[in-house]
Design a protein with these regions (language model features):
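Low-complexity, glycine/alanine/serine/threonine- and acidic/polar-rich repeat/linker tracts characteristic
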Residues: 44-47, 51, 264, 268
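Internal glycine-rich alpha/beta core junctions
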Residues: 1-33, 37, 55-58, 86-240
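Long, amphipathic alpha-helical stalk/connector segments used for oligomerization, subunit docking
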Residues: 231-295
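Strongly charged, low-complexity linkers/loops
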Residues: 289-315
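Amphipathic, heptad-repeat-like alpha-helical segments
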Residues: 48-60
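Conserved small/polar residues in nucleotide/adenosyl-binding loops
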Residues: 318-327
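Feature representing long, continuous alpha-helical segments
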Residues: 168, 212, 216, 220, ...
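Glycine-rich cofactor-pocket loops
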Residues: 68-92, 119-126, 198, 202-205, ...
Length: 328
């Protein structure tokens, strides 16, 4: 295409004479699709993850952190195995979410180092055949300057062309964050269930009417939306892992699959995190009456008596109260 365009710009017609630029000797000088393709994938992924994914995950973390501080004095019943457990503050519960997202951000940041290695200059199989001396270092510096990002030469261009482990590693980091965010969104959805027949401990923002047939119904659409995004990323990771295992000898030909999935996962995780923060987390309110009712009704408060009367006597109190409750 570039060669033909140059030919036309010189006033020539396609096919009437030799081309001004040779597609092989000029346009593709010192390059192979085997090293330029993975280089382009790494650049695109770095740009998207740095400018979108990480930026919006930090916004989600900040939104959760604000709610953690806001809810710090609201004591609620904890739940393990979906059953009543000992008390916890709503703020402490949200602080766990903050930590999950924070660890996820760090996991992605750590994976950026490997992703920043560019195999450009390795040409066909990683040896650098037909490239002039210093070509790789010069072009990597040029890419870094013009992209305003920090790139470096692949430590081993054979690995950079044949394996694409940097993509597998980075997508694994995205998958880890997706699993965390799925858990967070599901907790919030369950705590907001009801309003009368569910837990109803959280009041979620009413962003839109929830039903065309049930008046007044409000659905946790933001929780559901980001859950689907997380499921997609987890599915994409299976494909990326399989692609990573399919490098044969000096080349991995699954490059289009790597590119599609790392770009899609990075984009939808960033976009969904921003939407979840703005349209759900920022507007969450505690239903204090409901929280207090569950706390006061819970028999697990008896756990605090372990150090006073012992586990077995405390267990008898629990069993007795539970039996009385069942007979009511």
């Amino acid at each position: 295409v570039i060669s033909n365009r140059a030919h036309l710009l010189e006033g020539k017609k396609l096919g009437e004479s030799d081309k001004i630029l040779s597609p092989n000797d000029d346009v593709n000088l010192s390059q192979s699709s085997n090293d330029t393709f993975p280089t382009a994938i790494n650049i695109a992924a770095m740009k998207l993850i740095t400018d979108n994914t990480l930026v919006n995950l930090r916004k989600l973390k900040n939104s959760l952190n604000k709610k953690s501080k806001e809810f710090n004095k609201i004591v609620k019943i904890g739940r393990t195995h979906l059953m009543d457990a000992t008390p916890i503050t709503l703020g402490q519960e949200f602080s766990g979410y903050v930590s999950q997202v924070d660890h996820g951000i760090k996991t992605i940041e750590n994976a950026l180092d490997h992703l920043s290695e560019l195999p450009i200059g390795g040409t066909a199989v990683g040896t650098g055949l037909n490239t002039p001396k210093g070509y790789s270092s010069k072009i990597v510096k040029y890419i870094s300057k013009n992209s305003e990002m920090s790139f470096k030469e692949s430590l081993n261009k054979f690995e950079g062309i044949a394996s694409h482990d940097c993509i597998v590693e980075m997508h694994g980091a995205l998958k880890t964050v997706a699993a965390s965010v799925y858990k967070i969104s599901n907790d919030i959805r369950l705590m907001g269930s009801g309003p009368r027949s569910g837990l109803g401990e959280l009041i979620l923002p009413a962003n839109e009417p929830g039903s065309s047939i049930m008046p007044g119904k409000v659905n946790p659409t933001q929780c559901e939306a980001i859950s689907m995004v997380c499921a997609q990323i987890i599915g994409n990771d299976v494909a990326v892992s399989f692609a990573g295992a399919n490098g044969h000898f000096e080349l991995n030909v699954f490059k289009p699959l790597f590119a599609f999935n790392i770009i899609e996962s990075s984009k939808i995780l960033g976009d969904a995190s921003l939407s979840f923060a703005k349209n759900c987390i920022d507007g969450i309110k505690p239903n204090k009456k409901r929280i207090e009712k569950f706390l006061n009704d819970s028999l697990m408060l008896v756990t605090a008596l372990n150090s006073k009367i012992g586990y077995y006597k405390a267990c008898l109190l629990y069993t007795s109260d539970a039996a009385d409750e069942r007979h009511c």
